[in-house]
Every structure is written in C-alpha cells, then in structure tokens.
Design a protein with these regions (language model features):
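Extracytoplasmic electron-transfer domains, predominantly the class I c-type cytochrome c fold
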Residues: 60-121
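Periplasmic/extracellular electron-transfer cofactor-ligation site
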Residues: 31, 37-66, 90-98, 123-127
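Boundary at the C-terminal end of the N-terminal hydrophobic targeting segment
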Residues: 24-28
Length: 373
C-alpha cells in the first residue's frame, strides 16, 4: 500500500466513524457519584498529602523524588483527565513515571477513579489556566487555540512537479495562564526564479497568542493570535516576500464527544506594494484512539480543509485537502509525530503541487527529550 492509499484509507475510516453515535455523557449515566474526597484520603493521601499538594516529607513516604502538587493550577490544568486516569488505572509505568505509583484498576472502579479526579479538579475549578482537554492533536496548517510549551519541526516536499522542500522550526512558550509567544523560522530548498536551485532561510515569524475562552463543560475554546512576518528570506532567490507582513488569526476548537473540530481563520496583510492581501480559512476534523484499553499509545486521524483567497484581479479561491495521522511516540506522550499529504483540489500549477508532510513535536514542559520513554 502506498502512502497516498494509506492516507485516503485513514480519511475513509474517519468519515465512517463520524457517522457512529457519539459516546454518551458519563454524567447522565450515573445516578450518584462516589465520594472523591473520601476515596482520595483513603487511597492517595499517604503519598500525595491530605490536600493533594505533594508536601509529604521523603522520610514519611519512603522515597526521595518530588510528588506532584495538584493544587498548583499552572501544572494541574495542563493535563487532561485521560492522562491522570491512565496513571491511576495502570500505575506510573503507563506514562513512564516512577513505578512506585501503583495501579488502581483492580482496587477502584472506573466511577471511583473518575470521582477522585473530579475532587482534584475542584482545587482549580476557577483557574484561568485552560484545561488539558483542549490540547488537541495539532493539524498541519490549522493553528491551535490552546497555548503551548513546545518545540516542533514541520517538513514538506513536493511529490510531483518541480523540486521544492521546506522545513520550519517553531518554538512556543506560554506566558502566564493564557498567553503564548511563538517564533518560527523556515528553511527551504527550491528552484528559484532564475531556474537554478536555491537554498536558505525564509521569512521569520514572531507571534503572540491570547486565549479568551476555555469552557471545558461546553467543550469550546477561543483565542486570538497576531503575527509579524519579517523579511529575512531572499526575495531575489524566491525564499521570501521581501517585505514585512502582518497576520491576524481567530482560533477555535469544539470538542464533540470523541471527536473534535478546530478552526483557524486569518488575514495576511503584506506591507509592501505589489503583494495582495489574503484571507485564509483552515479547518480540521478528527478523533483520537488509544491502545491498551484507552490508556496507551494514541492515534489521531484528521482531515484538514484549507481555503485561500488572494484579493487581486483574476485570483481564484484555492482549496486543498490534507488527510493526516498523528501518533504518540513516547509513553509520556510528549513526543509526537504526524504525516499526511496536501492535495490541491483546484487551481494546480508550479506553485500548487501535491506535498508530503510530516512533523515532530516535543512538549518540553512535560519531560526532557530523552525522558518519558
């Protein structure tokens, strides 16, 4: 099976799954909840402390490493419920944490584990830090609304037509509870305007993202992002536009049971003459599956739809489709990879050829590059 056939098979599976009924809301299936606080005190407080602050002395718990502080919202709210649930069900080994964290899947029921998590969540219920449920799988082109601490590299190259390759390195750093700084720098190898091969850096972007809404109950997140693109690439060699450019993004995501929809609607406004303003709309729909009963390696097929409209005489609305698949590489799930193919749906030409794409992400807040495996 070729890569293109595999990607189209992924798309067909994803669309078929979209026709299945969504998972019922767990809250509607339960008449009453177990007492999460009492369960925590009986099963967890001996190591994690009575308040979940991880303040027990090493001499009291018998090991030296620092316990997590569940009252620290800058830490606790970054993680999704499924991450905590996996460590409780399968023990520390499930996410490459110390094996001193035992597995409770035979000691507590699923409902009791959910109640313990709900009790811990109550300590940061009114926190401004967006919940980890909104840290959805990254699509190739659709910027996420969730603020991140990560480094990634996205590489694309033409699969037909003239030779072209671009590799973009991106650094993202959270600022406070709801802000994020982003710096990206592309490196390209192309056939330039002269007809000869050209290699070098492209135009660097510096962006700031501000989250405005993150309602975990409704599954909705919304953020704004502004970016300045600097003319660091050579326009004469075809590696850059030769002018400053400004971008304004509206970012959103909606969680729908097991599925998610992400959107990135933005305008690109070049400062130099001769370059048209552009409007873009990128949208991604997908679902995440996990091995080992939902606690292991994650697989996230997505289908992305891209639109671009340049505001110049004779310019057509350009549309692309990008079937893709993300997979977690490390047990901590802080190292992820994705691959896919960008397929122009119309207006093909030398600058619009099918492209194979892949990326590697390192969520450096969760663990070091060589940790968590």
């Amino acid at each position: 099976m070729t890569i293109r056939q595999a990607l189209w098979l992924t798309l067909c599976v994803l669309l078929a799954l979209a026709c299945m009924p969504l998972r019922a809301d767990a809250a509607s299936e339960k008449q009453s909840q177990p007492d999460g606080r009492a369960l925590f005190q009986a099963n967890c407080a001996a190591c994690h402390g009575e308040n979940g602050a991880g303040d027990r002395k090493p001499s009291d718990i018998g090991f030296a490493f620092k316990m997590p502080n569940f009252t620290d919202c800058s830490f606790a709210n970054r993680e999704a419920d499924v991450d905590w649930s996996s460590s409780i069900h399968r023990g520390g080994r499930a996410r490459a944490f110390p094996r001193t964290m035992p597995a409770f899947d035979h000691a507590l029921s699923d409902e009791e584990i959910d109640a313990v998590i709900a009790y811990l969540r109550g300590k940061c219920e009114k926190s401004a830090w967006p919940r980890g449920e909104f840290n959805l799988p990254l699509a190739m082109f659709t910027e996420k609304a969730f603020p991140e601490d990560e480094v990634l590299n996205i590489t694309s190259f033409n699969t037909s037509g003239q030779r072209a390759m671009t590799s973009t390195s991106i650094f993202e750093k959270r600022l406070g509870a709801t802000g994020q700084l982003e710096v990206n720098l592309p490196f390209s190898s192309i056939v330039g305007p002269s007809g000869h091969g050209e290699t070098g850096i492209g135009d660097m972007g510096v962006a700031y993202k501000q989250n405005l809404l993150a309602d975990v109950d409704s599954g909705t997140i919304f953020s704004l992002l502004g970016e300045v693109v600097l003319p660091t690439g050579s326009a004469a060699k075809g590696l850059g536009d030769g002018t400053f450019s400004f971008e304004t993004h509206a970012l959103f995501a909606q969680i729908m049971g097991d599925y998610f929809l992400q959107g990135d609607v933005f305008g690109a406004l070049p400062a130099g003459k001769g370059l048209p303003n552009e409007a873009h709309g990128n949208f991604s729909f997908g679902r995440t599956f996990a091995e080992d009963g939902g606690w292991g390696r994650s697989w996230s097929p997505q289908i992305e739809f891209l639109t671009t409209q340049a505001f110049a005489p004779g310019e057509k609305l350009q549309m692309d489709i990008v079937p893709q698949l993300q997979v977690s590489l490390s047990r901590r799930q802080h190292i992820l990879a994705s691959f896919g193919e960008r397929i122009p749906l119309n207006d093909r030409g030398p600058d619009r050829q099918p492209q194979f794409m892949f990326y590697i992400i390192w969520d450096w807040y969760d663990a070091g590059l060589l940790q968590g495996w």
